[in-house]
Amino acid sequence: MSGPCVRIPFWVRVFLLLLLYRIAAGCPELFSSGCSCTEDRSKAHPTPGTRRKVSCGGKELTETPEVSLLPNRTVSLNLSNNRIRMLKNGSFAGLSSLEKLDLRNNLISTIMPGAFLGLTALRKLDLSSNRIGCLTPEMFQGLTNLTKLNISGNIFSSLDPNVFMELHSLKLVNFHSEFLSCDCGLRWVPSFFRSGSARLGDETLCAYPRRLQNKPLRLLRESDLSCEGPLELHTLSLLPSQRQVVFKGDRLPFHCTASLVDKITALHWRQNGQPVTSDPTKGIHLEESVQHDCTFITSELILSNVHVEASGEWECVVSTGRGNTSCSVEIVVLENSASFCPEQKVNNNRGEFRWPRTLAGITSYQHCLQLRYPSLTLGGGVEQKKASRNCDRSGRWEEADYSQCLYTNDITRILHTFILMPVNASNAVTLAHQVRSYTLEAAGFTDTVDVLYVAQMMHKFMDYVTELRELSEVLVEMGSNLMQVDDQILARAQREERACSSIVYTLETLAWPQLHSHAQDLSRYSRNIVMEAHLIRPAHFTGISCTVYQRREGAAGSQVHDGADLSLEQQLRFRCTTGTHNTSLNAFHLKNAVALATVSLPATLFPPNAPPDCKLQFVAFRNGRFFPFTSNFTGHSDLARRRGISTPVIYAGLDGCSMWNQSDPIIVSLRHTSPGHDPVAAHWNSQALGHHGSWSLDGCQLIHSDVSISTLRCSVLSNYAVLQEIPDFPGSPSIPVEVLHPVIYTCTAVLLLCLFTIIITYILHHSSIRITRKSWHTLLNTSFHVAMTSAVFAGGITLTGYPIVCQAVGIVLHYSSLSTLLWIGVSARVIYKEALLRTPQQLEGESAVQPTQRPMLRFYLIAGGVPLIICGITAAVNINNYGDNIPYCWLVWQPSFGAFYIPAGLIILVTWIYFLCTVFCLRQRNFQESKDLQCSASDPSNLPESQPALSGSTSLLSTDSGVSPVHAGTTVEDQYSLKVQCLALMATQFVFVGLWCCGAMAVWHVDRERKLFSCLYGGTATGLGIFLVLHHCFKRLDVQAAWLGCCPGYHRSQPMPAYSHPCTVTVGVQSASERGSQLFVACHPPTDPNHYSSSARSSSTQSGTASITVVPSKLTNLLQVSQDNANNASRAPAGTNTNTSTSTENNKPTNNLLPSLLPVQQPQRRKACSRTKGGNTQYHHRGDARSHYRLKALRAGGGGSMGALGPSGTEHSNIYHVHKHASSENGSLRNSHSEGQNGLLTNGRHRGEGLATSPSEGSDGGSSGSRKPFPLLPSVARRAAMQQNAQCRSASKDNLKLAAAAERESKRSSFPLNMSSNVTATASLSTVSAPNGTLKGSVVELDTSGTDQSQGSVGMKSRVWKSETTV
């Protein structure tokens, strides 16, 4: 079945036929080969009919087309993008008209001579992007008219100078190549193109050497084209290139390819550095080297039967006339059953290396630790260093090679850099000082190579000691610093590299080059090493004695003052005298000096035939660390056990002569520096044990020894020491601890006693001390942190000999100092908030916003958390910031700025901002109060004579006392006013800062300045402690009461508190009748306003329960009351009442009946009809006669009684009542023994001060529940409303209404007597009590019961009139 036929339009058929005819008519011979032929339509030739352009590009031709097939007039031939490999001789013969030949992008590698013959008209030839390696002048024969030649992109690396000799018309040439080497082989290029008409194209760039890479060749000069420098080959490869692991018997071929540099270039093979030759018996077949395209040379090596011996490095070596180079590959030949080396982790001074599980016979490589500044390769990349480790055939790790890796320790790496530096006379002193600066930290050396590198540098510097005398001083200091290195590290350095022997040799020969006729003496001092050298004449030698000594520490005769180097006192020194003297170390004649060793050389030291000049040198070492016990004693192996050097080591040596064998012995005395027993005399034999050195007992004899000094007699010149047996369990070496001045310890103890007195008192008597909850917390924490700071300072500031303890002391001091300042700041904020909430703006009627409750934990997070964070960060960054190389346990200087001084300054600044704000609030409040008093005085209300005012006590006898002016003072929940609290806190901060500064100066300074600041510290500490304990304990009445309450006989001896308790201060001047008629019922006298501003409750409680308690309001002897009132009125000035009672209760301002939680804004009316029910009573009424008699006394002594029913309008005019809330922060009202004595109402308030909200209820605290206001009588409620609307209004009408209400109340009450109306009102409101001790007659039942155990409540438990003295 055939598909549908597609019909081609007729006109399309005609067009195709015409096209084919046209092609066939132009070049019919090329139609079968796929080439195309077109006419040349260039303007230069107006007759294009005879000129042809043939294009055979991209036709996959493998050779050039036959010339006979091309048109005769072919002017352009395109053979690009084919696969032509060779141009034969005469390939284009006959194309005499050809002007352009394009042969680019082929595979041409060979051009035979005469390939372009006959192309006399050729102008452009493109041979780019082929594989031409050899170019000769014969290749371009016949191209006489060629103007443009492009041979770029081929594989040649250089060109023959005569290559373009046949091209006479050449104008432009390009021969860029990726292998083009711009060296001496192309030195002809600049002159050739400069002298001829040809031009080198800009595309011709250099590829090699690297210094000329990508630079245009035409811009280079002949001097740039040189063959100097290392040989760089554009090609050098070895296959296989990676490490090969093969088994025994395998076949392994190698193929090496290299650049053909010159005619003598050759390839050779090596195995493990040994030449390899062809040996068929061993399976080694080596082929001859072959050259390719005049560019490459190759060689092949075949291992037909690999043996185990073939393991190792196989290397292909390229030898040229300009040098040799090579590449290699590692071959590992394994047995058929191979083992493995286990995985292993190694930590050393080069870093941490993890060697993996490796097959036996394999070398494993690990990258070195990358440092901050890695080295760069010549190519610009990062040079990756490696460590190697071989796993032997038995499956065991060999020693690794870490030489290419850098040291991880900074000091070690720097010392290694010094080793690599060249030393000469110009830089020797500079390098020596730099090395010496790094040896200052020798105590922290942890590697033996540190000691080794310093020893090697000292040996290098010895070559320049003669011309640079300063070097000897630096070398002695280097050796002295190295004696601080740990004993074990020095011992290992001696065993491994004999580093200690090298150092000792350098020091003991240091003076020889510097002694001559013009410099006959040399002395060098340091802390641990001292050297003395002399040029002597043996013929005149009479003996010499040299003593090593040092200054006593802190000697009075020391000349070292502030600013001088204190280490000069501890330097070792020599004192030499001529003649032989038996100098005793204990009787050393220099004042304030300690002799450590002495050596006496006899007069017969030199033989008779000694040379005329001789050099004598003494060297003393403070200890024997440079002379470790690397092995047993020479000749006395049994004495080497558990022995150590217990004395300094002193050396005596000669240069240029020797000791006479018949000389008298040398006498050496040495002082013991460590305990031990069984001493032996020894000298150091540097030649023993293969020049490692050892102590020898031959030649020295111990002639005397005691606890402190040993004397030796030796017959050889050497290093001398005394060896003692070390105990089996030696005690830890005692580290000297610097002791502060005794006044610091004494006065710190006084300060701690005072502070802990405060802390213990406020903790044990928490519920008895009237202080806000926040103030209680801040006071205890401030005291505790001040105690911590002073105790840690006195006990640990000088413990620098114990690094860990010293760091802990520094951290604790840092924390406690900042925390103390923060707690003082928190206290300042608390006072400021309290002052802010008592400003007149809120007292005059602004509605107080109910604050939200906030926990006390925030204070601890600020005052304790912030210092903890600062200290933690400081210690985490570098724990050595505390007590590192400083004589006290504190922060080092530079980190202390950001970690302590700046935060401390900010804390003090913020604290003083709070202080200033508090002062501003208090000044504003005092100004408003003075204005209120002036307003009250400008509109007085006349009191009738029948109402002599009882001042603040007037309202105590009425139920509307919540709106009466009962000494409306501030209800600060502290005995001190805000002003006193603020001033005390300022003084505390100032004295603490002074205490801290004096302590710091006492530690920092020395001698007299230290004593001065120690005394200042003691005085400041004592003053701070006394001030705090006086202010917070002795001057507080509640603290006194709490202390006295601890005495067993205090309650039984305390007098009745209710006999004479004057109440409040009357504003203005009172008449005699008014003062004499005042009746004070169980209230306290007003005193100095700055002294008493107690609240009706304590805020230090944790309870949230509000219990209403009152003080005993019992009336006792009325006559006594009248007499006391008359006496008080006569003694006290107008407006002031003075207390005369000795009871503690009388010294506390209380408020007997005024509810402290009474709001004025919403006065509530409530009928007071509750009565106290019957209960157990201890006292009963004694009859109406006695009560009637008391009533007469009351009338006779009290005058009119209506004044007691209500205050005047003047007293009401300037009183502000603010609702008081109990909260979890400021404490709750509670029924406790401590509060029973003071009751719920405060009588001791200042005139004109409102019942301000405590700071605890401010923004820092919240209400836990509002108290319900006490109910008021109707007249009282109306009067309260009138007081809010008009402050300066007469209250006489209100007083009459209040009296009437009181009279009705008295009739209703259970008063035992039927008195007249004017007396009944007073008594019924004040003295009616129930058998259970509750006052009745007011709208609130007030509890007056108490026990003997109560501190402040010594009230009666019966009715008011019982148990009274009858007058």
From Swiss-Prot:
Belongs to the G-protein coupled receptor 2 family. Adhesion G-protein coupled receptor (ADGR) subfamily. Proteolytically cleaved into two subunits, an extracellular subunit and a seven-transmembrane subunit. A motif (PDZ-binding) lies at residues 1364-1367. GO terms for cellular component: plasma membrane; Wnt signalosome. The gene is adgra2. Residues 681-730 are annotated as: GPS. It is a multi-pass membrane protein. Disulfide bonds join 256-316, 700-714. LRR repeats lie at residues 70-94, 95-118, 119-142, 144-166. InterPro entries: Adhesion_GPCR_A (IPR051963), Cys-rich_flank_reg_C (IPR000483), GAIN_B (IPR057244), GAIN_dom_sf (IPR046338), GPCR_2-like_7TM (IPR017981), GPCR_2_extracell_dom_sf (IPR036445), GPCR_2_extracellular_dom (IPR001879), GPCR_2_secretin-like (IPR000832). This is Adhesion G protein-coupled receptor A2. Residues 938-949, 1224-1241, 1344-1353 have a biased composition (Polar residues). Residues 1136-1156 have a biased composition (Low complexity). GO terms for biological process: angiogenesis; canonical Wnt signaling pathway; nervous system development. Residues 27-742, 805-809, 880-896, 1004-1011 are extracellular. It is found in: Cell membrane. GO terms for molecular function: G protein-coupled receptor activity. Endothelial receptor which functions together with reck to enable brain endothelial cells to selectively respond to Wnt7 signals (wnt7a or wnt7b). Plays a key role in Wnt7-specific responses: Required for normal central nervous system (CNS) vascularization where it functions cell-autonomously in the tip cells of sprouting vessels. Has a role in development of dorsal root ganglia. Acts as a Wnt7-specific coactivator of canonical Wnt signaling: required to deliver reck-bound Wnt7 to frizzled by assembling a higher-order RECK-ADGRA2-Fzd-LRP5-LRP6 complex. The leucine-rich repeats (LRRs) are important for potentiation of Wnt7 signaling. Interacts with reck. Residues 938-958, 1126-1156, 1221-1271, 1339-1367 are annotated as: Disordered. The record marks 356-357 as: Cleavage. Keywords: Angiogenesis, Cell membrane, Disulfide bond, G-protein coupled receptor, Glycoprotein, Immunoglobulin domain, Leucine-rich repeat, Membrane, Neurogenesis, Receptor, Repeat, Signal, Transducer, Transmembrane, Transmembrane helix, Wnt signaling pathway. Residues 230-332 form the Ig-like domain. Residues 764-783, 831-858, 918-982, 1033-1367 are cytoplasmic. Residues 178-228 form the LRRCT domain.
